[in-house]
Amino acid sequence: MSEVPHFVLYEHAAGYALMKIKEFDDAGLILQEVDAAHADGYKFSQIVELASFDPFKNTEAALENCNSISEGLAHPDLTNFLQKSLPKKKKHVVLGINDSKLAGSLTEAFPDLKLVFGGVITEILRGTRVHFERLAKNLPHHSLSKAQLSLGHSYSRSKVKFDVHRVDNMVIQSIALLDQLDKDINLFGMRIREWYSYHYPELFRLAPDQYKYSRLAVAILDRNKMAENENLENEILEILDNDSEKTAQIIEAARTSMGMDISDLDLENIKRFAARVSSLMEYRQQLHEYIKDRMDHCAPSLSALIGEQVGARLISHAGSLTNLAKYPASTVQILGAEKALFRALKTRSNTPKYGLLFHSSFIGKAGTKNKGRVSRYLANKCSIAARVDCFSETPVSTYGEFLRQQVEDRLEYFTSGTVPKKNIDVMKEAEEAAVEVKEKVIKKKKKAAKKAKRLAEESVTATAEAEVDEDAPKPKKKKKSKAGDE
């Protein structure tokens, strides 16, 4: 049974409150009393009363204290408040607190103070939270609710800003969209080929690429009217990257095609669908460039080691870059092969050697006997790269490039027996090279920030000048005299 506290610390959005507890001989009795008084504010006020309250100076101070408490640190405002509010002789004083993480910091500030948490303290704080407006009669109730709302918004905003790896959320969504686009493009590409092959079946063999096929279908459309379009040959040449031989084959095959004639309405629908498919393929390429750019900002070392797409899939499967950095190399190795792993454990057969890492070029280069070894080694380097990217203030791709060279040296060792460099020597070289790159990146960021600030100031100045010009009184036009008309 926990000890009965003399005081309980309650952290409100408006400030710190010290609640005085009615004296009880046994914690079991106070627990029964508190449980019985939860629904009745008057009964609860007979057990708990407000001894002291210290409001925060402003919203910034409230947010600062809130962040300190969430990290388990006693803010100077809190220690000053307890120093003033608690009895001078703290040797036999028992203080109840909500969070056990705060105990260590308070014990350093008040060595003689006895701290308790959990059990009856939780119930007292729950009742205090419900009936605080009744207990704090002198405080305006509307200001308490406003303080809670303001602090809630500020704390949430600071947490979102503190998440330095929030860019990985964009990577996760983008790689999921890329995978979905690949499926849709393959499905739509086959559909347009089947549809247009009724009219021009030979084009399927002459243009196997889906993107070029879709563009050719839009350009040619009705093969019987190709002679009417004088610029058609140039369009086909452009689509086929100036391959004149292939262009001549397509034009010749269109003249002697065995396809059936299709109405203009059907051809119009084929044209619209083919244009949509080709635009989807163009957007897919743009999305790939976007993922590459995001990965260079979010995880440059991981991207340099195994490529943008495989790295993005690892982050997506782990849930975030932070989660991936926390995984051991053995988990990274089989990430994406969970079904095969559990099936192997259930049937007591061999566990999988790799998951998403199979799509890396290193696994394809390795021999059959060495695929498992290379997979283990690559997973180890991926784990290191993820941790470097996650916990570096200025992530750069230097470490990933050196780690990639290590994997290539290991492949060379398996094939020719050439002994690679020691890991400690490679990491020293990487550290020296990374320092120079980081300095350049920081300089670029500072220049970009200065430029953005200057542009913002110019924009504000221009807006202010425009408003002044609008507010300035316009000169009145003189009325023409009617004397001349008379």
UniProtKB/Swiss-Prot annotation:
Residues 450-486 are annotated as: Disordered. One of its GO terms (cellular component) is box C/D methylation guide snoRNP complex. One of its GO terms (molecular function) is snoRNA binding. It comes from the Eukaryota. One of its GO terms (biological process) is ribosome biogenesis. Residues 475-486 have a biased composition (Basic residues). It is found in: Nucleus, Nucleolus. Signal peptide: none annotated. Keywords: Nucleus, Ribosome biogenesis. Residues 298-416 form the Nop domain. Belongs to the NOP5/NOP56 family. Required for 60S ribosomal subunit synthesis. This is Nucleolar protein 56. It comes from Caenorhabditis elegans. The gene is nol-56.
